Amino acid sequence: MFDIGFSELLLVFVIGLIVLGPQRLPVAVKTVAGWIRALRSLATTVQNELTQELKLQEFQDSLKKVEKASLENLTPELKASMDELRQAAESMKRTYSANDPEQASDEAHTIHNPVVKGNETQHEGVTPAAAETQASAPEQKPEPVKANVPESTETASVAAIDAEKKSAAPVVESSPSSSDKP
């Protein structure tokens, strides 16, 4: 791998022994060996992935060649039917894109009665009546959620709601009466 001979390796070992000493040299050798193992495994992994990608690419290329060859070997009837299907699909795409999506939705939700013929001609010229006013519902306030509350507080909250409803009711002005005087 590094193209190092035995004498060169022995020289590196002796220099390492002198520089690091006998106690730190085994730890340094283990560390360097771990780095070399990690680099080798990384290189092997990259090489395997590249070969897999190349094989996959070759396989895809061969599949494309086979598909082209099989399409060229089709009978004229099959080619004609494939062309018809393509044309039908293209015309469907064009008609769908030409139509307004809302109009297509309205048409899909329209019920056509084949028994009654000329239904549209009978109602030709008739316009629907327009409403002068629209109906509306009175506003409703959400009721408070009732949890495990004692009945005394529950009746108090009901009384508060009733008082709130009464205060929301229109007040009719009246003339002062004798009961208002002290």
Swiss-Prot record:
The keyword Transport applies. It is a single-pass membrane protein. Belongs to the TatB family. GO terms for cellular component: TAT protein transport complex. The keyword Membrane applies. This is Sec-independent protein translocase protein TatB. GO terms for biological process: protein transport by the Tat complex.
